[in-house]
Amino acid sequence: MPVRNRFAELLPEITAWRHDFHEHPELMYDVHRTAGLVQERLTAFGCDEVVPGIGKTGVVGVIKGKSTASGKVIALRADMDALPIHEETGLEYASKTPGKMHACGHDGHTAILLGAAKYLSETRNFDGTVVLLFQPAEEGGAGGKAMVDDGVMDRWGVQEVYGLHNMPGLPVGHIATRVGGLLASSDEFEIEVTGKGGHAAAPHDAIDTTLVASQIVVSLHSIVSRTVNPIHRVVLTVGTFETDSTASNVIAHRAKLKGTVRTLDTENRKLAEDRVRRVAEDTASAFGATAKVTWTPGYPVTDNTADEVAHAVEAARAVADSVDPETPPIMPSEDFAYMLEARPGAYIFLGNGDTAMCHHPAYQFDDSAIPLGCSWFVELCERRMPAS
């Protein structure tokens, strides 16, 4: 990889940070140790500002270039939280906390951004301001939204925002991204079906919620195939089916379904919600039952803007072995989406080699990907804000 030589020198130090984070995983907003170490290191690097407590437990660092005459302000983001998973890697530096694991590589993301921060603080070879966003609670807590709601973009005048995520299956040295939806929105629904309980021997005197809910499940799975344009990506999954009966000779009075819908655009996101409600309510009504639908919006689409993708790709081509600027979108979700709703920006995938997929107990972050991640952040800042 044509990465910057300085990161080859810094790799042992950055790797040690990463391994320390890996040994001490923290969940959601409870990232006090991690955030404290980030704050300590940013201060030691000589950042112009280091502000904790943004978005509850997020940390912001500010690095000014040799000049700030350009007025440009670019934000770089890394997530800090781990997952409630019991680690099965067998690593010497495996999690010391049973039931908690950095199974998505956020320890690597945090270490990469710290490495970039150290370099940028040393060199300051740019005309403008870099804002470092160390974010809690990506794994379901919407920490990105919390930082945006806390005014991080306005307080520091951020104009563009960039982030990365390691990607198992992509070779180390490879960077991939795309214009538009890179990762899906993720919404959840719950459908409570109420009928009329009764004896299994007298179904004519009951309204069988098991039957009604089963028909709803079948009909829900026709939404994607029969109402969504086939060139668009939408995933609908019913994940749980429960009734209030545990006996074989009882017709349940109530049944409950829970599921998720993932889309890559706002139009289909709205369409999916409308159709789920209509299918559930109308199907239940046809059987003489009722259906109450509770829709819980989750993360939006991670929607990269065209100009910023072009900048991200240009920087990537300067430091990576290979770059895919038109990678296919994938259907997991990511709360960097909230930052992209607030400002133009781009999110990239950083090759993590041949390992178990994210969220698997055997997942491993590849430390050899660190220099490229650091180099990309630095290259991006220096190209977007060239020194005079």
Question: Each predicted region: which residue ranges?
Answer:
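Acidic/His- and Gly-rich active-site-bordering loop/insert found
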Residues: 1-102, 107, 111-114, 118-126
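Divalent metal-coordination and catalytic microenvironments
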Residues: 21, 61, 76, 106, ...
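Active-site beta-loop-alpha junctions enriched in small/polar residues
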Residues: 26, 79-81, 137, 167, ...
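Conserved acidic residues
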Residues: 48, 158-159, 344
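Histidine/acidic-residue-rich, glycine-tolerant segments that coordinate divalent metal ions
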Residues: 59, 82-85, 89-101, 107-108, ...
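Non-cysteine beta-strand/loop elements that form the S-adenosyl-L-methionine
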Residues: 75-77, 86, 189, 347-352
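Metal-dependent amide/peptide-bond hydrolase catalytic core
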Residues: 211-388
